[in-house]
From Swiss-Prot:
Site feature Cleavage, where: A344, S345
Record's protein name: Photosystem II protein D1 2
Annotated residues for binding of [CaMn4O5] cluster: D170, E189, H332, E333, D342, A344
Family: Belongs to the reaction center PufL/M/PsbA/D family.
Binding site for pheophytin a: Y126
Subcellular location: Cellular thylakoid membrane
UniProt keyword Magnesium present: yes
Note: Cyanobacteria usually contain more than 2 copies of the psbA gene. 2 of the reaction center chlorophylls (ChlD1 and ChlD2) are entirely coordinated by water.
Record lineage: Bacteria, Bacillati, Cyanobacteriota, Cyanophyceae, Acaryochloridales
Binding site for chlorophyll a PD1: H198
Signal peptide location: none
Gene3D superfamilies: Photosystem II protein D1-like (1.20.85.10)
Annotated organism of origin: Thermosynechococcus vestitus (strain NIES-2133 / IAM M-273 / BP-1)
Length: 360
């Protein structure tokens, strides 16, 4: 008689947990980045919803003049926002346990810091989770690279800009009109419209929208007929089919004749790389622009660039923009200061209008 002994293959609880976390068979992939992403995004979302609805007014400027931001304190869906933490807090980390009471924490805008820090950690981990799932499936890593653009933009306005300005009270307000207020004040203080990196960001967003519309309409217009006139053309595609569902040669020929030959891609892979890269690079530059202006390396200043023979200024559009910027600057934070820095800097220093003559 032969006896066979075999050790039982029983994985311990930790190994089973690891297998479940990293399994690509789950309906939603979790991953190790997801272990951090899920609780942080949940915390940010729950706090945002509660604060947006019911947070009491916040002393944003640190001068004991609270600003109401929530729906229950008189705002509507357009004007409501989570108001940034107080200028009295500055760049200090302000968790709940650092305040003397919950009322003090709310008055100083503590929920804003809780939301943005958890949100930023969450989207960083979402980007890492994209890479992790791509790695597990044997895919190339360009999806998280593309997502790095909005991550960089969010990091710029929620973290880098407040660090450069010295206070989280200067961060992006979490609401609709609050976002517009941030944009307008940013223009007044940094002249962002005259910054080349912002211009590249505009080209990236508008160009990306244009290219997406062009690509979608070209493909839709050159579908290979698989259905009758009475059926939807969408039924002509079966998920996972090997053959192309549209005629790229026809699309290339059309667009090459509409513009010129070399404006049209004849390689599907390079085309789709271009469609991804254009808006991503543009938004990277926009985020870089915010991050440099955070430290007051501002947009171009062409004020008083044109003068006549008597030295009188001939206004250009740059001067019109400058006057608008100063007007906006004197209106915002109306009780925090009397004059903007541009007006409080003293008399203008004279500059030479002509080169001095050089004696031999």
């Amino acid at each position: 008689m032969t006896t066979v002994l075999q050790r039982r293959q029983t994985a311990n609880l930790w190994e089973r947990f690891c297998d479940w976390i990293t399994s690509t068979e789950n309906r939603l992939y979790i991953g190790w980045f997801g272990v951090i992403m899920i609780p942080t995004l949940l915390a940010a979302t729950i706090c945002f919803v509660i604060a947006f609805i019911a947070a009491p007014p916040v002393d944003i400027d640190g001068i004991r003049e609270p600003v109401s931001g929530s729906l229950l304190y008189g705002n509507n869906i357009i004007t409501a926002a989570v108001v940034p933490s107080s200028n009295a807090i500055g760049l200090h980390l302000y968790p709940i346990w650092d305040a003397a009471s919950l009322d003090e924490w709310l008055y100083n805008g503590g929920p804003y810091q809780l939301i943005i820090f958890h949100f930023l950690i969450g989207i960083f981990c979402y980007m890492g989770r994209e890479w992790e799932l791509s790695y597990r499936l044997g895919m190339r890593p360009w999806i998280p690279v593309a997502f790095s653009a909005p991550v960089a933009a969010a990091t710029a306005v929620l973290l880098i800009y407040p660090i450069g300005q010295g206070s989280f009270s200067d961060g992006l307000m979490l609401g609709i009109s609050g976002t517009f207020n941030f944009m307008i004040v940013f223009q007044a203080e940094h002249n962002i419209l005259m910054h080349p990196f912002h211009m590249l960001g505009v080209a990236g967003v508008f160009g990306g929208a244009l290219f997406a519309a062009m690509h979608g309409s070209l493909v839709t217009s050159s579908l290979i007929r698989e259905t009758t006139e009475t059926e939807s053309t969408n039924y002509g595609y079966k998920f996972g089919q090997e053959e192309e569902t549209y005629n790229i040669v026809a699309a290339h020929g059309y667009f090459g004749r509409l513009i010129f030959q070399y404006a049209s891609f004849n390689n599907s892979r390079s085309l789709h790389f271009f469609l991804a890269a254009w808006p991503v690079v543009g938004i990277w530059f926009a985020a870089l622009g915010i991050s440099t202006m955070a430290f007051n390396l501002n947009g171009f200043n062409f004020n008083h660039s044109v003068v006549d023979a008597q030295g009188n200024v001939i206004n250009t559009w740059a001067d019109i923009i400058n006057r608008a910027n100063i007007g906006i600057e004197v209106m915002h934070e109306r009780n925090a200061h009397n004059f903007p820095l541009d007006l409080a800097s003293g008399e203008l220093a004279p500059v030479a209008m002509i080169a001095p003559s050089i004696e031999a």
